[in-house]
Regions:
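Active-site PLP-lysine loop of aminotransferase-like
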Residues: 96-97, 125
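Short, ordered loop/turn segments at secondary-structure junctions
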Residues: 73-74, 95, 157, 217
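Divalent metal-binding pocket/active-site signature
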Residues: 124-170
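Active-site neighborhood of divalent metal-dependent phosphoester bond hydrolases
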Residues: 112-130
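Short, conserved structural micro-motifs that define repeat-unit consensus positions
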Residues: 43-47, 149-152
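Ser/Thr-glycine-rich phosphate-binding loops at phosphate-binding pockets of nucleotides
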Residues: 45-46, 68-75
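Charged catalytic cores and adjacent phosphate/nucleic-acid-binding surfaces used
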Residues: 1-39, 45-59, 64, 79-92, ...
Length: 320
C-alpha cells in the first residue's frame, strides 16, 4: 500500500494515525523518556571509526536517560562490551559495509545472536581493514541476518555517496527488491543533510516500512540528536518487535555544518588506512553517476520524440 505523507510544521504523519511518526526537531529527551523507551539506534565507538570508548558512551547515554545501539563498522567488540553492562539499556547491533559499498544496519534480540551472526557469516568475508567493504553482497548480508532473526534497516538510504541503498550503483528494480527484504529504513540520520532525510522519510512511508532514527554519532556531542522511540518494555526484543510491526516514532535534527566537519575529521584516522578500497568504490560510484546521467538524458530524448510522434499522429488524424 502506498502512503502519501502529509506535512505539518516539522512533522510528517499519515492518514492511518493521528500521531506524528517523524518529527524534525531536537528531541526533548527528558519528556520522551518519561513516556517511552527511547534509543539512539546508530552510534560508533573507537572499535571502528568513532572517537569514544564504550565507557564514555555508556556514561553519556545514562546521563541522557536513553538506550544506545553501538553499531560499529564491520566490528562487534564495542556492542559486546556494551551488552556486558547492566547500567545502560542497549541493543546489540552492527553496521556492515557490503561488497557494493552500501551500508546495512542489523540489530539482534541478544548479544549472543549478534556474535553467532558475526562469527559464522560475516567474519570470514571481512577485508583487511575495519572500514574495508566485506566480500558479501547486499542480498547475502540480509539473508544471513534474517537467518539469525536479525532486524535489517537501511541507514541513510539517500546520502551524498554510495553508502545508501538508493544510489545509481543499484538499478531501480534491485533497489526495490532490497527494500522489500528489509524491516525498516533510517528516516532521520543526524549526520545527514535535511533534504536527504526528507527523501528517506517519503521512501519509508511509500514502502510501508518500519521507521528508525539515529545520530550516526562518532563523538559524544552527537548522541541523542536523533532517536527512535516506542511504547514498549525496555528490552531489545520488545523494541525490535516495534520496528518490525511499524510501531515506532522518530524525532531528530541534523547537526550543524561545523559539527559535521568535526565529526568527519575524527574519522580520518581509520579511513586513512583504507584509501585503496575507498578509491575503488568512489571510481565505481562516479561511473555509475555518469551512466545514470546518460540514461536520464537518453530517456528524456525518447520521451520527447514519443510526444512529437503522438502530436503528429493526432494532427494527421484531425486532418483526415
Amino acid at each position: 500500500m502506498i502512503i502519501q505523507p502529509a506535512k505539518s510544521g516539522n512533522a510528517f504523519f499519515t492518514d492511518i494515525e493521528d500521531n506524528h511518526r517523524v518529527v524534525f526537531q531536537r528531541p526533548a529527551l527528558s519528556a520522551l523518556t518519561n513516556a517511552y523507551t527511547v534509543v539512539d539506534l546508530h552510534f560508533h565507538s573507537r572499535h571502528s571509526d568513532g572517537f569514544n570508548s564504550v565507557d564514555a558512551i555508556a556514561k553519556r547515554a545514562r546521563k541522557l536517560g536513553i538506550g544506545i545501539a553501538i553499531t560499529d563498522h564491520n566490528a562487534i567488540a564495542g556492542a559486546v562490551e556494551m551488552a556486558e553492562r547492566k547500567d545502560v539499556f542497549c541493543i546489540p547491533g552492527i553496521e556492515i559495509t557490503a561488497r557494493e559499498g552500501a551500508h546495512i544496519l542489523v540489530y539482534f534480540d541478544t548479544v549472543n545472536d549478534l556474535i553467532d551472526f558475526y562469527e559464522t557469516d560475516v567474519a570470514p568475508w571481512l577485508g583487511k581493514n575495519v572500514m574495508t567493504s566485506c566480500a558479501m553482497s547486499m542480498e547475502s548480508i540480509v539473508a544471513c541476518a534474517k537467518k539469525h532473526n536479525g532486524v535489517v534497516v537501511f541507514p541513510h538510504p539517500y546520502c551524498a555517496v554510495y553508502t545508501g541503498v538508493c544510489n545509481p550503483i543499484f538499478s531501480r528494480r534491485r533497489q526495490e527488491s532490497l527494500l522489500s527484504m528489509a524491516d525498516g529504513v533510517e528516516v532521520i540520520n543526524g549526520a545527514n543533510v535535511h533534504r536527504w532525510n526528507l527523501k528517506s522519510t517519503v521512501l519509508g512511508f511509500n514502502m510501508n516500512m518500519g521507521l528508525t532514527a539515529g545520530s550516526d554519532g562518532h563523538n559524544l556531542f552527537q548522541m541523542g540528536s536523533a532517536v527512535t522511540y516506542a511504547a514498549c518494555m525496555r528490552e531489545p526484543a520488545a523494541f525490535l518487535d516495534a520496528i518490525r510491526e511499524k510501531m515506532t516514532w522518530t524525532m531528530g535534527k541534523e547537526v550543524g555544518f561545523l559539527r559535521k566537519v568535526t565529526s568527519s575529521s575524527m574519522k580520518l584516522r581509520t579511513n586513512f588506512n583504507n584509501t585503496s578500497d575507498l578509491f575503488g568504490k568512489n571510481m565505481r560510484y562516479g561511473l555509475a553517476l555518469v551512466h545514470s546521467g546518460s540514461r536520464k538524458v537518453r530517456d528524456s530524448i525518447h520521451e520527447t520524440m514519443a510526444r512529437r510522434r503522438a502530436v503528429k499522429k493526432q494532427r494527421k488524424f484531425n486532418i483526415v
